[in-house]
């Protein structure tokens, strides 16, 4: 009986090729959308590691549906926690206008537990703890919610890669992320992360009914500390009310020596 060696080799090659292609469906280029989404989000999150602490002055510009503007000046400080299982700390302090001068929001970000947030109201001379059920509400009349002013910790969300597409002159990875922490005001968020410096360019917020609520656009990125990038303008548009809030940052200062002592609840009433 004759044996067709060439035919057998062809069949063997075909089988090996099929096995290789099947392996790609679960590893390498064939990563699941969830694994790929988490990998991209982690790369973006970790690209900013190592800044230590930061101080920056910023301007908040509120626009109503008619286009009328109100401006507020704010000091914003943050303290980085190197352990990904421990959230960062931040402090927002209003300097103007006079009627809200001294108002301060202290945030201790958590991972899956509700963030710890306290609001100091100088007119009442008291510190108010923000309950987890109120964190989806607007922060001092802006289009940013209380939960938007805490650190976006990597493990607060589950992720799914959706697609790759142009975003301006760049190319972005588009990810869906779903809050894993309790009582979020959002059912999901969709983020655009650029492939050049791995920074957020756009973020869509969907309300609890699954309807698009707000769109955040981040621009004017500048580099600090050899690889630490910061946006100098956020534009948050509420597509349901047509209102908008912009945040405009001045130059950042990093590694200024801040410690946990600067982010204690008991010191809120003495902050100036």
Regions found by a protein language model. Name each.
Residues 2-16:
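Bacterial N-terminal signal peptides that target proteins for export
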Residues 151-157, 164:
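Surface-exposed beta-loop interaction hotspot
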Residues 42, 106-108, 116-120, 126-130, ...:
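Gly/Pro-enriched, hydrophobic low-complexity segments
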Residues 15-25:
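Bacterial N-terminal signal peptides
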Residues 32-123:
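N-terminal mature ectodomain segment of secretory-pathway/periplasmic proteins
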Residues 28-30:
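Boundary at the C-terminal end of the N-terminal hydrophobic targeting segment
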Residues 75-82, 160-166, 219-222:
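Short amphipathic beta-strand and strand-loop transition segments with alternating hydrophobic
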Residues 271-272:
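Short, solvent-exposed mixed-charge patches
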């Amino acid at each position: 009986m004759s044996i067709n060696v060439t035919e057998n080799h062809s069949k063997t090659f075909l089988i090996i090729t099929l096995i290789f292609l099947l392996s790609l469906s679960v590893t390498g280029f064939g990563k699941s959308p969830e694994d790929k989404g988490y990998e991209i989000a982690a790369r973006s999150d970790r690209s900013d590691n190592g800044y230590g602490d930061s101080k920056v002055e910023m301007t908040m510009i509120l626009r109503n549906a008619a286009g009328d503007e109100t401006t507020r000046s704010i000091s914003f400080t943050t303290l980085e926690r190197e352990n990904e299982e421990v959230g960062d700390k931040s402090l927002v302090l209003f300097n103007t206008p006079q009627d809200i001068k001294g108002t301060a929001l202290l945030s201790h970000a958590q991972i899956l537990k509700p963030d710890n947030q306290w609001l100091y109201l100088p007119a009442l001379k008291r510190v108010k703890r923000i309950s987890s059920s109120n964190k989806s509400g607007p922060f001092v009349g802006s289009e940013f919610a209380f939960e938007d002013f805490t650190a976006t910790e990597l493990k607060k969300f589950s992720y799914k890669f959706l697609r790759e597409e142009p975003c301006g002159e760049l190319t972005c990875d588009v990810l869906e992320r779903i809050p894993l922490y309790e009582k979020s005001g959002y059912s999901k968020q969709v983020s655009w992360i650029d492939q050049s410096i791995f920074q957020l360019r756009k973020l869509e917020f969907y309300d609890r009914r699954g309807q698009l609520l707000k769109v955040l656009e981040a621009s004017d990125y500048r580099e600090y500390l050899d690889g630490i990038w910061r946006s100098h303008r956020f534009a948050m548009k509420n597509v349901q009310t047509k209102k908008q809030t912009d945040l405009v940052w001045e130059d950042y200062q990093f590694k200024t020596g801040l410690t946990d002592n600067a982010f204690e609840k008991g010191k809120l009433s003495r902050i100036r």
